[in-house]
Amino acid sequence: MATKRSSSAASKSSSARTKKSEVTQDQLMSWYKDMLLMRRFEEKAGQLYGMGLIAGFCHLYIGQEAVVVGVQGALEEGDQVITGYRDHAHMLATGMDPNGVMAELTGREGGYSKGKGGSMHMFSRDKQFFGGHGIVGAQVALGTGLAFSDKYKKNGKVCATYFGDGAANQGQVYESFNMAKLWDLPVVYIIENNQYAMGTSVARASSETHLHKRGASFGIPGEEVDGMDVTAVYDAAQRAVEHARSGKGPFILEMKTYRYRGHSMSDPAKYRTRDCLLYTSPSPRDR
C-alpha cells in the first residue's frame, strides 16, 4: 500500500503552490494499484451489501481514492491516521489486510474488531490507524488529542485527521482548531470535500464554502487541492506534513473531490442528476 513545506497563515490555492515534488514511475504505479484495489474493494462491498451479507451502515469511498493514497504517500512510518465513517480505503492505505477489513464488514470473528465493529468501527494499533468513527466530527477532537500525545512524547510524528465538508460545520472542530494552534500540535486536518453532506450541498450548508479558510482566525494555514489528482494531493500533503512535523503547528488541506455513489448504501442520491457525475473513468485520474 501507499507508504511511506512550510506555508504562511494565509490560505492559498494549489495552483499557487511551490515547486512540485519529484514523483517516480514506480510511485505512480504503486498509487494506481492502491487506488484500483480500493475501487474494487468498495465495489465488492456494495455488491455484498446488496446480497444482505453486510449489515448496518456502509459508506463507500468510490471516487475519492486519490485523496487517501496521495496523503498516505507523504506520511512516515509511525504517523497516525484517524477518520470518520467512510473509512474502508483509509484502512487499506495504511496497509491493513483487505481480508481482515472485509471480514469485519461481514461480521466475522477474523475482522479487525472481531466482527463487532462493522463498517464504521475498525482499528489497528500496529498500523497506527485509530478509526473509523460513527459520530460526525468526533474524530477531529480525537486526532487533535493524538497529536498532543505526539508532541508530549517528542517523537516527531504527525497525525493525519480526516473529516468531511459536513463535519466541518461541527462545533468541536473549531474547539480542536483553537487548541491545536494554541499548542502548535503536529496535526494535518484533511477536509474531504466531496460536495455533499448526506444530501445537502456545501453551498446550502456553509456560509464560507472555501473550507480551507476555516482556520484563518486561529492562524492555521490552509490550502485547496484538486482531490481527483493524486500527484497534486501528494505534493500538497508533503508540504502540510513538513509544516506540522517541523513544529509549526496544524495545517488544513481541503481536498476538492467527488463521491460517485450515495452518502451510504441506503441513499439513492436523487438530489443530483446524471450530469453532475463529471468523472466517469474506472479509476481516479493521476494526471
What annotation goes with each model-predicted range?
Residues A2-A55, E77:
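Cofactor-/ligand-binding subdomain signature composed of acidic, glycine-rich
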Residues A89, Q195-M198, R259-R261:
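Short gly/pro/ser/thr-enriched loop/turn and capping motifs at secondary-structure boundaries
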Residues A232-P268:
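Structural signature of the thiamine diphosphate
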Residues Y279-D286:
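Conserved small/polar residues in nucleotide/adenosyl-binding loops
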Residues L185-Y189:
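A glycine-rich helix N-cap at a beta->alpha junction
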Residues A167-G171, V230-D235:
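Active-site glycine- and acidic-residue-rich loops that bind
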Residues Q195-T200, I220-V225, K270-L278:
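Short beta-alpha connecting loops at secondary-structure transitions
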Residues E43-G46, M51-W183, S201-S207, H212, ...:
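Cofactor-binding active-site loop characterized by glycine-rich and histidine/acidic residues
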